[in-house]
Amino acid sequence: MEMRRSVPVMAIVVVVVLALAALRSREVSAASRPNPHDDFHTADRCVACHNGLKTPQGENISIGLQWRASVMANSSRDPYWQASIRRESIDHPDASVDAQDECSTCHMPAQHLIDKAEGKKTEVFARFPLLKKHERDAFAEDGVNCSVCHQIERKGLGTPQTFNGNVEVAGAGNQNHREEYGPFLPDTGHKAVMQSSTKGFVPQQAIHIRDSALCGSCHTLITTVRGPGGKAMGQFPEQMPYQEWQHSDYNKKQSCQSCHMPQVAEAVPITALYGPNRVGMHRHVFIGGNFLLQGMLNEHREELDVAAQPEELQEAVNRTSEFLRTQSAKVELLDLRKTADGLSFVVKAQNLTGHKLPTAYPSRRAWLHITVKDSAGRTVFESGALNPDGSIVGNDNDADPLKFEPYYSEITSPDQVEIFEPILGDSQGHVTTGLLSAVRYLKDDRILPAGFDKASAEPDIAVVGGAHDDPQFAGGSTQIRYVIRGGQGGPYQIKAELWYQPIGFRWAHNLEPYKAAEPQRFLSYYEADSRKTAIVLAEAQGTF
């Protein structure tokens, strides 16, 4: 009897021991499993060594300070981006989760890649406002940060495989060795210090960090068109500056980085800790076209939880504005002549950039403001004046959201305005500013870069509308004739200005019906700053 009772007792002991061993094995496995949060660092870790940098002339070129005032650093804080995602989620509630995840790819890249590694989609709204409620939000708030860009692998860059931010990062899941790519060959000492101080991040020289294809990964944005029930209905080429650059003369002579990250002329160190002088360092200012956003970040820095200091943001606004005024466009007056009943002249608008002008986000527009005054200083003709609310006098789209201003090869009336812009159309052919509703361009007459052949351009970057058939609208520039009738009392003073606005009136005011916090907040910002929403890129004057 005693022996028969001992068998089940032993069996129970064996089962318990095996169960404990299995549990212990799972605990060890979970503890040793790589944590996706370790694949990146927030920018403050990098700033510790890459600050306190100056040129021999005393210019502060500290990488961290320049970066944190840039649009890249504040990509997730951008109030217009937040408002736009909310608008799309209201328009397409069944696709809201997918839209948030898709948009976070480039606006919250570190957080997106962490979530992706954990098998989750990034929920943008779960992280608004960005107030560092817990450690996990630090990556969401960090925008396009150092460790994301410098860990992007070369594989697939410049191909559809990596567009929309679908890049691979170096060393993902490797706790002891994650490569951080840079343009310079690291010395042994700094390499060892960085690896130990960052717990596994290793600097590695790689030429692709200066390749335009790296920028093209996020600056090629093809959105998913959404229909009823959030159903995917196709794709739409929302932003294509990389392809525009490829189709221009600039792809042979200038990279994205050479313009948007201006090179330091002198040899300078890139780290404050005994760094050797490096020739060819690029400033991390990421100059672009959105002075309006940088101004809003400064004015509302507390509400938006902006890390950059007021003077840094103001410097960024000034730098962006100066860049636009000096390096983006040129205007000329040609063929001035008197006619039997007035006068005529040609305005030539030249694009000095390596992509369309304006480019990227379709809220951007440029236009010609023309004034003609007689000898007494009276205005006898004006087209394209800017209203105090940010709208353009005579622009059909600003007056009526269902209409838009066509392209003109010749302007004869003050209510005709030459506006260089993209106009989006939905599946019904109606004008829209809804990114997930857009299926095609109804108009795209943004000024082409030099060397851009509109006849051979791919459909995604094609010229659309009347400009397509105008021989004067060509690579590098366009020419528009103005014919003014009834003018008397010359000589006449003619002034031609090319204006630019990062967020057009219609794109801002189409948010009015959306009563959620983010759209209403941005609209209040825009209305308060409406007189500062546009600047003059170039101008020309003439008398005859």
Language-model features and meaning:
Residues 53-90, 120-462, 468-474, 480-486, ...:
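Primarily the internal scaffold of c-type cytochrome electron-transfer domains
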Residues 2-12:
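Bacterial N-terminal signal peptides that target proteins for export
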Residues 36-39, 43-44, 96, 100, ...:
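Residues immediately within or flanking Cys/His clusters that coordinate Zn2+
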Residues 11-21:
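Bacterial N-terminal signal peptides
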Residues 105, 109-116, 126:
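Conserved, well-structured interaction surfaces
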Residues 489-491:
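Extracellular Ig-like/FN3 beta-sandwich strand-entry sites
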Residues 27-57:
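N-terminal module-boundary/linker segments of secreted carbohydrate-active enzymes
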